[in-house]
């Protein structure tokens, strides 16, 4: 027999949004706990999929002979996730969160199913293109789940309690990355890379059921409910060419015709997008939000945070293996401790946000800690030890863990209730754009700095395997036995190989200096901007019976 909160179908009933407060009402303790479970479980399932993929995707790419398209899954993910965030945010403001959240969770199930079956599906795509397609579904799911989960928390709790639960949600987002890569690697090694994807399907199915039955629906009472299709089209029109150009420039140059064409298309369509949004009835990006000085400053900070966050997340393992010479297992352990520091800081800062007199101080402290940790990473050299790198990474992780829920709460407390979804979507959107731009810059500079140290060391007429091996530095550790055989017939071959490996390490070190220094500069600029946030007290509001 169901509780009074359930309808005859066993589902939680629809509830109305109190526009003046932005919270779900009415809500008992049971309903709030069930709704919170419905919010958190999809985030956990999604993060587990992404954590396992860190170890499984490289093996899948090798198995499917797709190394020449190695970057395309990441590109597909960034494209769909970045575009999905503002679109889902706006549509959820118009028609309610639940069904768009459920659609996002269903999309997340497509990823492990498609990846696990890649190369065997009866569709007109080869195995690698099936992985790329699956990454697009993952990006769609990521964009929807990330923006809607944080918005649902803002709907469910008053401003005075949001910080605590935003911190919990941010921790759930990060926690699987402390164990996911190592567990996914173990499954890949002992079973197969396909099972590293399939193992996540049951949790995803459970998440679908919990969202459907436990998460309340919302009935929006809006005088108008038009969809900004022109805004969606022009958003895709300027953003997709920009991200493609930033992704491909590392493989060519800024003067390449296709890069120029993409950048010109993006530059032409961006002002058209802004013009469309200015006059749209229900815009995807509510430009009037940026009349609020605090939202504008926090949005800039989130963009800068995205540069540093993606920089350390992608290049810390490469730094450990390429510069310090750590094994993959030790590199994974360091990354896991870094991720754990983010989780711990999420939880602590979430509670502090509910008690702090001025959240501005948390933003200043978090950006300052992160900038310091990244700057120290930029000063390392070949004698730097793994514990020293770990200490710097943890310092950065604590800073990021403080910033994530702090920025979310600052924006949500400043935004009107009817624009809560759009405001939250803008923050997630800008973080992804910052990360995409940062990674494109870092990828380009990594290759250029690396080759400036290595190319002049390779003699003319060198065996093709030698030249090809050093054109692909990420595979050097695996190719070293074959390279020794390749240079055995060259005069001073052993000395040449030793010099090449030294040059490769020096190139990596110089590139890491650049990457972490730019990341530190972005967070230092963010710290300065945080000084101008002004008084940002933790707002009070009606409390939930928790």
State the predicted function of each range:
Residues 2-35, 39, 43, 473-546:
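Transmembrane-helix exit segments and adjacent C-terminal regions of multi-pass membrane proteins
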Residues 35-84, 192, 230, 257-259, ...:
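Transmembrane core module of solute transporters
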Residues 44, 75-79, 106, 167-175, ...:
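Transmembrane alpha-helical cores of Major Facilitator Superfamily
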Residues 60-61, 91-92, 183-191, 246, ...:
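Interfacial helix-cap and linker-helix signal at transmembrane-aqueous boundaries
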Residues 84, 89, 96-107, 128-130, ...:
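C-terminal module of multi-pass small-molecule transporters
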Residues 85-231, 257:
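Helix-loop-helix hairpins in multi-pass membrane proteins, especially solute transporters
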Residues 186-301, 308, 326, 334, ...:
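Hydrophobic transmembrane-helix bundles of small-molecule transporters
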Residues 189-201, 248-259, 448-520:
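A membrane-interface helix-boundary motif in multi-pass transporters
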């Amino acid at each position: 027999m169901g509780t009074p909160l359930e309808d005859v179908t066993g589902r939680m009933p629809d509830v109305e949004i109190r526009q003046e407060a932005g919270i779900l009402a009415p809500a008992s303790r049971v309903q709030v706990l069930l709704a919170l479970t419905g919010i958190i479980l999809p985030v956990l399932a999604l993060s587990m999929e992404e954590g396992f993929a860190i170890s499984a995707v490289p093996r899948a790419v090798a198995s499917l002979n797709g190394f020449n398209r190695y970057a395309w899954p990441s590109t597909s993910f960034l494209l769909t996730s970045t575009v999905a965030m503002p679109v889902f945010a706006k549509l959820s403001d118009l028609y309610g969160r639940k069904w768009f959240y459920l659609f996002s969770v269903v999309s997340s199930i497509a990823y492990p199913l498609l990846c696990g079956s890649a190369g065997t599906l009866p569709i007109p795509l080869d195995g690698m293109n099936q992985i790329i397609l699956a990454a697009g579904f993952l990006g769609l799911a990521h964009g929807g789940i990330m923006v809607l989960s944080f918005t649902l928390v803002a709907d469910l709790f008053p401003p005075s309690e949001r910080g605590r639960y935003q911190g919990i949600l941010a921790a759930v987002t990060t926690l699987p990355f402390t164990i996911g890569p190592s567990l996914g690697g173990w499954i890949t090694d002992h079973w197969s890379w396909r099972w590293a994807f399939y193992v996540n399907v049951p949790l995803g199915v459970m998440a679908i059921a919990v969202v459907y039955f436990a998460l309340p629906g919302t009935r929006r009472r809006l005088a108008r409910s038009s969809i900004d299709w022109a805004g969606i089209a022009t958003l895709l029109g300027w953003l997709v060419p920009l991200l493609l150009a930033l992704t491909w420039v590392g493989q060519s140059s800024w003067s390449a015709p296709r890069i120029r064409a993409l950048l010109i298309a993006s530059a032409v369509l961006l002002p058209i997008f802004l013009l469309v949004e200015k006059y749209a009835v229900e815009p995807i990006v509510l430009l009037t939000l940026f009349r609020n000085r605090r939202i504008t400053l926090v949005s800039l900070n989130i963009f800068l945070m995205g540069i540093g966050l993606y920089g350390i997340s992608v290049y810390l393992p490469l730094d450990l293996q390429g510069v310090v010479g750590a094994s993959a297992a030790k590199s994974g352990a360091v990354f896991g401790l870094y991720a754990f520091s983010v989780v711990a800081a999420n939880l602590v800062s979430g509670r502090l946000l509910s008690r702090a007199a001025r959240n501005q101080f948390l933003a200043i402290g978090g950006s300052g800690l992160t900038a310091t940790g990244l700057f120290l990473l930029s000063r390392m050299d070949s004698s730097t030890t793994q514990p020293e790198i770990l200490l710097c990474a943890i310092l950065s992780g604590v800073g990021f863990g403080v910033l994530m829920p702090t920025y979310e709460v600052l924006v949500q407390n400043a935004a009107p209730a009817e624009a809560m979804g759009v405001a939250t979507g803008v923050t997630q959107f800008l973080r992804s754009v910052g990360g995409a731009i940062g990674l494109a810059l870092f990828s380009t500079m990594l290759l250029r700095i690396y080759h400036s140290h290595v190319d002049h060391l390779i003699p003319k007429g060198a065996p093709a395997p030698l030249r090809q091996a050093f054109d692909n530095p990420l595979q050097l550790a695996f190719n070293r036995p074959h390279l020794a055989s390749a240079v055995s017939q060259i005069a001073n071959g052993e000395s040449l190989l030793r010099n090449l490996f030294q040059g490769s390490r020096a190139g990596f070190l110089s590139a890491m200096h650049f990457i972490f220094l730019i990341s530190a500069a972005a967070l230092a600029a963010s710290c300065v901007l945080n000084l101008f946030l002004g008084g940002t007290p933790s707002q009070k509001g009606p409390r939930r019976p928790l």
